């Protein structure tokens, strides 16, 4: 899929004004091997527990983007190299983590986009806590399941509908 978030913003100023196209605050850093990715959002709300993240990535991604609202925790990682490889194997376009990742060198080798706040060497808990397919909030922006995510070097967009 070829697009530029800058061009999408320019072409859809009406959607930006209406709030059906939103721009995430520029605080996420790239860690995956794909610099540009897009797809409908699958959402998770978790806190310092990545059990649901693994369960989601074990499923066929079908070109979707997994959006993980990790509560902006900087105390452990929710995604690492093994989950990045799993996402690539199962056809996920990308992963957006409102929290941390680890195994940064391994994530760079995966042909999937990965964005997160930071890296952290500690793994998460495995309690199975969290919610799936619910509206989440990432950097103050609400993202509902099925909304479209567009990410590249210039930023991340959330759209109520497909723009390409």
Swiss-Prot record:
Q: Does the keyword Lipid metabolism apply?
A: no
One biological-process term from Gene Ontology?
regulation of RNA metabolic process
Provide a Gene Ontology MF annotation, just one.
Answer: ribonuclease inhibitor activity
- Names of the cofactor(s): a divalent metal cation
Entry's cofactor comment: Divalent metal cation.
**Which Pfam families does this chain map to?**
RraA-like
Q: Which InterPro entries match?
A: RraA, RraA/RraA-like, RraA/RraA-like_sf
Q: What is its EC number?
A: 4.1.3.17, 4.1.1.112
- Similarity remark: Belongs to the class II aldolase/RraA-like family.
Outline what the protein does.
Answer: Catalyzes the aldol cleavage of 4-hydroxy-4-methyl-2-oxoglutarate (HMG) into 2 molecules of pyruvate. Also contains a secondary oxaloacetate (OAA) decarboxylase activity due to the common pyruvate enolate transition state formed following C-C bond cleavage in the retro-aldol and decarboxylation reactions.
Q: Which PANTHER family match?
A: 4-HYDROXY-4-METHYL-2-OXOGLUTARATE ALDOLASE 3-RELATED
Assembly state and interactors? Homotrimer.
Q: What is this protein called?
A: Putative 4-hydroxy-4-methyl-2-oxoglutarate aldolase
Q: Which organism is it from?
A: Burkholderia multivorans (strain ATCC 17616 / 249)
